[in-house]
């Protein structure tokens, strides 16, 4: 993401997982794990939406962690359709999470679906994520679970990969608000600064000393 990005591997259930970490300029105030879109459609941790979410996290004083799902980049294994990728995310979360810091979770498209699965798993274990953001959730393609009421859900009005209607159908039974970006497609072309602002605004109250 920048010259200071630190790259290493974490042991995962399918082998080595390629990880990238970006640090804030000041004191670390938490950890944000950002999950990338569908591997079979070219999704990687260097996707521009993923990097935007990571930059927003860093701006709030969070250590931003990205990684490649199994079979992507230098990560071992092969695409598993969701369950294996959730296991990958859980392995990275366990490796980078610090019990003394807030833990935030964000995902884009397929990564947002995996984020719902990981969030449910963490909650069941008694160690839920403190913040959750879902961008372009692939609700029409994968069975996303219910999420906490505090979750930020962002979708493009003209998304032709995952129709807005599919996300509204998922959100409706939960009475979950959805932030719709007018005119934005799935990849938020020309709207990435706004996307960064939306995440920063949603999470800023938890980090007031860095966001005021």
Question: Where do the PLM segments sit?
Answer:
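Gly/Ala-rich beta-loop-alpha elbow adjacent to hydrolase catalytic centers
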Residues: 107-115
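Catalytic histidine-centered segment of alpha/beta-hydrolase-like enzymes
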Residues: 184-196
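N-terminal cap/lid segment of alpha/beta-hydrolase-fold proteins
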Residues: 1-27
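Short alpha-helix in the alpha/beta-hydrolase fold that links the catalytic acid
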Residues: 149, 163-171
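Alpha/beta-hydrolase active-site loop
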Residues: 79-98
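Short beta-strand/loop motif that positions the catalytic acidic residue
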Residues: 147, 152-155, 159
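Acidic catalytic loop of the alpha/beta-hydrolase fold
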Residues: 157-162, 186-187
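Short, surface-exposed "cap/lid" segments of acyl-processing enzymes
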Residues: 25-66
């Amino acid at each position: 993401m920048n010259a200071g990005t630190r790259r290493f591997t974490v042991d995962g259930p399918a082998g080595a997982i390629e990880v990238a970490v970006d640090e804030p300029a000041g004191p670390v105030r938490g950890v944000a794990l950002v999950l990338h879109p569908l591997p079979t459609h070219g999704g990687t941790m260097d996707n521009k939406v993923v990097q935007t979410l990571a930059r927003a996290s860093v701006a709030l004083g969070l250590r931003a962690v990205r990684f490649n799902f199994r079979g992507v980049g230098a990560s071992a294994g092969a695409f598993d359709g969701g369950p294996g990728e959730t296991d990958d995310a859980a392995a990275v979360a366990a490796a980078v999470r610090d019990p003394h810091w807030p833990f935030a979770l964000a995902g884009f498209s397929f990564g947002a679906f995996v984020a719902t699965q990981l969030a449910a798993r963490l909650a069941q274990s008694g160690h839920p994520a403190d913040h959750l953001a879902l961008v372009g959730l692939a609700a029409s393609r994968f069975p996303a679970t219910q999420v906490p009421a505090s979750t930020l859900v962002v979708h493009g009005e003209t998304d032709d990969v995952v129709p807005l209607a599919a996300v509204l159908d998922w959100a409706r039974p939960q009475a979950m608000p959805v932030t719709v970006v007018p005119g934005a497609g799935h990849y938020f072309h020309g709207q990435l600064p706004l996307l960064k602002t939306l995440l920063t605004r949603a999470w800023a109250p938890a980090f007031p000393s860095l966001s005021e």
